[in-house]
Amino acid sequence: MLSNGISEDDLFSFLSLHKKEDLDHRYILSSMCTLPHPVAVRAHCMFMETNLGDPGLFPGTAALERLLVERLGTLFHHKNAGGYATSGGTESNIQALRLAKALRPGSSPNVVLPESVHFSFKKACDLLSLEMRSVPLGTDRRIMADKAAELIDKNTICLVGVAGTTEYGMVDPIADLAKIAAQQDIFLHVDAAFGGMVIPFLPKPVPFDFALPGVTTLAVDPHKMGMSTIPAGVLLTREPDMLDALNIDTPYLTVKKGYTLGGTRPGAPMAGALAVLDYLGISGMKAVVAGCMKNTERLIAGMETRGIQPAASPDVNVATFVCDRVPEPWKVSWTRAGHLRIVCMPHVTADRIEAFLSDFGDMYA
């Protein structure tokens, strides 16, 4: 720490130098986060000092969190869902497995999940001492439900499906998994961190949420396609009081028990998430998702005309290609199998797709 403070001008000149080192969003094609919507930024600024971890001090902010859970529960066909605002998919997935373990205690617990799960499940299983049983994917890059059923035994505490895989943008056959979960009385967690704010707004959404009786919990990230400020995730539960199984005593706060993973929890991004939902509504979100899907289709078609084949036929706005290089200064990512991966987020507009295709064509000319 500095012995003496510096002037405000010098401070912000210093900060600006480092901010300039961050990448320009115009060239970011790999991220599942995006530029926040202006109403999210405005709402965030209104609630910057609030702490959801001590709701008795911020009852208005806590009421907005309950409203956000209700809004999303309704979107996912269960208005009376329980849940809370998390820091994102990683926390939501950890908490879902923590809940599953609490509800079915045992000496050798295991979790059955697809090979395509987000790396947060490795963290969760390490923290909770859970055995990971990975289910192979079919040729369509979705979990093979019949293989999942074969891996379930008396020590299985949770079955996991993904609605919008991080690498290829696929939606697992959640309906099939839900049937298995219901038949075997197994906790089913759906990781819809990405797809949760995409699938409901598609012309023909596939079933993946609480409309399926076997689904127990669901994770969704408003800071992805919901265009909230970061970090903004939500974990939803079928039963409104289900998370009480995780309660611990919090004697020196304004509430005496708590089940959240974080202690201090920012109200600002939660308010930003709710602001976007209420500002855009169903029709507005449909327009956003339609634009992203159109850009994804255009990107795939444009790459094919340049001789580059897609690695998958995605269910959401993630495009992958059999390709080993891209032009500078575009920032992309690569799947574990070595495929080029591009996420067509709201900031990846139609003109950016055309600019990328033009640069790509020049490089391969």
Swiss-Prot record:
- Give the N6-(pyridoxal phosphate)lysine positions (modified residues): 224
List UniProt keywords, sorted A-Z: Decarboxylase, Lyase, Pyridoxal phosphate
EC nos: 4.1.1.11, 4.1.1.25
Recall the GO molecular function terms of this protein's record: aspartate 1-decarboxylase activity; pyridoxal phosphate binding; tyrosine decarboxylase activity
Q: What class of enzyme is it?
A: lyase
The identity of this protein, by name, is: Probable L-tyrosine/L-aspartate decarboxylase
Q: Which organism is it from?
A: Methanoregula boonei (strain DSM 21154 / JCM 14090 / 6A8)
Which prosthetic group or cofactor does it need? Answer: pyridoxal 5'-phosphate
**PANTHER family named in the record:** PTHR42735, SPHINGOSINE-1-PHOSPHATE LYASE 1
Q: Which reaction does it catalyse?
A: L-tyrosine + H(+) = tyramine + CO2; L-aspartate + H(+) = beta-alanine + CO2
Is-annotated flag, keyword Cell membrane? no
InterPro entries listed in its UniProt record: GrpII_AminoAcid_Decarb (IPR050477), MfnA (IPR020931), PyrdxlP-dep_de-COase (IPR002129), PyrdxlP-dep_Trfase (IPR015424), PyrdxlP-dep_Trfase_major (IPR015421), PyrdxlP-dep_Trfase_small (IPR015422)
Q: Which family does it belong to?
A: Belongs to the group II decarboxylase family. MfnA subfamily.
Question: To which pathway does this protein belong?
Answer: Cofactor biosynthesis; methanofuran biosynthesis; Cofactor biosynthesis; coenzyme A biosynthesis
Question: Any idea what job this protein has?
Answer: Catalyzes the decarboxylation of L-tyrosine to produce tyramine for methanofuran biosynthesis. Can also catalyze the decarboxylation of L-aspartate to produce beta-alanine for coenzyme A (CoA) biosynthesis.
